[in-house]
């Protein structure tokens, strides 16, 4: 964590102490496709590692991004080191509109596709975050966790994300059970903030890469 490239010498690795799988996740069905990673040691926050808000309720967002690791030619000495963190502007689609395109759409899911005219291609890293901005409060929220999609991000083929807001009660219950309870922020009742030391990481169960990335604004291709 704390890097944009696997070849970065500042790469920080964290040991996962426990993986908490949602009890309703039953493959091949992808409803409740979510897990929590509890880390063995605390994260020391700095300008490139910061906590993110979690929405308590679903709402419509008009400025969102999806992050993923992408292979970049000409960087790194080995293919594994050529992975760079990219972000892509995406547009949230209403549940009703998405249900017309996706059969048996769960209420626990939300949909988004690539914003028209946006450069880049959504590869669909399972577990990648969908992050949206609230400009009134100047806060970022992790609204979704990528689950599945076929050439997701293209118009007509939305990417499917687990809706974080739908799982807040479960997150509260599990973090409380582990003695690392997620707490309601005193500043606002519209978002949740983690405790002072340990922070749960939300991840789709199909994810192959642990993605911990924050956004400081739409200022670059990363």
Each PLM stretch: what is its role?
Residues 62-192:
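Extracellular trypsin-like serine protease catalytic domains
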Residues 1-7, 54-59, 89-94, 150:
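Short edge-strand/loop segments of extracellular domains
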Residues 20-26, 42-80:
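Active-site substrate-binding loop(s) of clan PA
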Residues 11-18, 51, 84-89, 161:
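Well-ordered beta-strand positions in beta-sheet-rich domains
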């Amino acid at each position: 964590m704390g890097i944009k490239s696997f070849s970065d010498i500042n790469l920080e690795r964290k040991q996962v102490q426990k993986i908490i799988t949602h009890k309703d996740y039953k493959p091949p069905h992808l409803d409740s496709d979510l897990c929590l990673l509890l880390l063995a040691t605390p994260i020391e926050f700095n300008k490139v590692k910061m906590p993110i808000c979690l929405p308590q309720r679903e709402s419509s967002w008009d400025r969102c991004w999806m992050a993923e690791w992408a292979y970049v030619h000409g960087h790194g000495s080995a293919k594994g080191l050529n992975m760079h963190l990219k972000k892509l502007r995406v547009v949230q689609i209403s549940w009703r509109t998405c249900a017309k395109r996706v059969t048996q759409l769960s209420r626990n899911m939300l949909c988004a596709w690539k914003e028209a005219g946006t450069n880049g291609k959504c590869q669909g890293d399972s577990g990648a975050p969908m992050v949206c901005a609230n400009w009134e409060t100047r806060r970022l929220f992790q609204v979704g966790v990528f689950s599945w999609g076929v050439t997701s991000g293209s118009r007509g083929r939305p990417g499917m994300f687990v809706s974080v807001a739908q799982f807040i009660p479960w997150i509260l219950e599990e973090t409380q059970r582990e003695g690392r309870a997620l707490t309601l922020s005193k500043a606002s009742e519209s978002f949740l903030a983690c405790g002072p030391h340990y922070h749960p990481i939300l991840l789709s169960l199909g994810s192959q890469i642990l993605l911990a990335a924050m956004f400081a604004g739409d200022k670059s291709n990363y």
